[in-house]
Amino acid sequence: MFLNTLRPGEGSKHAPKRVGRGIGSGLGKTGGRGHKGLKSRSGGSVKPGFEGGQMPLQRRLPKFGFTSRQAKYVAEVRLNELATVNAEVVDLAALKSADILGHQIKTARVILSGSIDKAITVRGLKVTKGARAAIEAAGGKVEE
């Protein structure tokens, strides 16, 4: 038995009611939509948030905040991600070639998350105080 072969037991599910197939079915002619009106027509429905012409809530409330465009180009790198890089000197190019950073990233900051036990040299990256202490405790160094 596999997840993609699971089926309900035979007879446990009713077949869906076919709509608009004659008056004997009970759902013929108007097909359960009633007579006239917006919701009886094909494609006819009110959009989400429509309040009958009253100014909708999402337009009554003020706009707020913004999306930082800098966030596209700045990334955080954890210490345990640095440990996976097979290079003595870890810089932006080494992180990109190890598929830790995307190609759009222009600067990165090393943060204290996880642990590192091999000595590496971090060059050209911003490093937090805690991460700097952990790198130096493991025998590595940080170059600006």
From Swiss-Prot:
Residues 21-31 have a biased composition (Gly residues). Part of the 50S ribosomal subunit. The keyword rRNA-binding applies. This is Large ribosomal subunit protein uL15. GO terms for biological process: translation. Coiled coil: none annotated. Keywords: Ribonucleoprotein, Ribosomal protein, RNA-binding, rRNA-binding. The keyword Ribonucleoprotein applies. Belongs to the universal ribosomal protein uL15 family. GO terms for molecular function: rRNA binding; structural constituent of ribosome. Residues 1-57 are annotated as: Disordered. InterPro entries: Ribosomal_uL15 (IPR030878), Ribosomal_uL15/eL18 (IPR021131), Ribosomal_uL15/eL18_sf (IPR036227), Ribosomal_uL15_bac-type (IPR005749), Ribosomal_uL15_CS (IPR001196). It holds the Pfam family Ribosomal_L27A. HAMAP family: Ribosomal_uL15. Binds to the 23S rRNA. One of its GO terms (cellular component) is cytosolic large ribosomal subunit.
